[in-house]
Amino acid sequence: MRYGEKEIKEFDVENMEIWPNDAKNDYIIKITLPEFMCCCPRSGYPDFATIYLEYMPDKFVVELKAIKLYINTFMYRNVSHEASINEIYNTLKDKLKPKWIKVVGDFNPRGNVHTVIECCSDMVVPK
């Protein structure tokens, strides 16, 4: 097993590295993760997406290698588009406790269907 595979397989989300946010100003962090992959829970075929993460930190920020490793843990998991984005959103919201957070998964088309999943802490439900 190569070192990257080992890091991904051994990554424990409970120990995700987060750092203190010492900034006094409110600001937005935007992270793009263009190589997300998970496996369809029905067929096992791979699904690919770009994940867009935006958040306004409060006391903590996520370390960039930690978020990369966490996202890569989905690579061999059988999980739906909806479940994967909701899990990422909930994990980061629980770990970082940001003032505001949004996670978007823009999935590559498969079978002529393009899916975008969005979770946001200030989501307004359309009527």
Swiss-Prot record:
Domain of life: Bacteria
EC number: 1.7.1.13
Keywords recorded for this protein, A-Z: Cytoplasm, NADP, Oxidoreductase, Queuosine biosynthesis
Subcellular location: Cytoplasm
Involved pathway(s): tRNA modification; tRNA-queuosine biosynthesis
Transmembrane region(s): none
Gene3D superfamilies reported for this sequence: 3.30.1130.10
Active-site residues, Swiss-Prot/TrEMBL: 40, 47
Molecular function as annotated in GO: preQ1 synthase activity
Catalysis: reaction(s): 7-aminomethyl-7-carbaguanine + 2 NADP(+) = 7-cyano-7-deazaguanine + 2 NADPH + 3 H(+)
InterPro entries: GTP-CH-I_C/QueF (IPR043133), NADPH_dep_7-cyano-7-deazaG_red (IPR050084), QueF (IPR029500), QueF_type1 (IPR016856)
Function description: Catalyzes the NADPH-dependent reduction of 7-cyano-7-deazaguanine (preQ0) to 7-aminomethyl-7-deazaguanine (preQ1).
The protein's name: NADPH-dependent 7-cyano-7-deazaguanine reductase
UniProt source species: Campylobacter jejuni subsp. jejuni serotype O:6 (strain 81116 / NCTC 11828)
Gene: queF
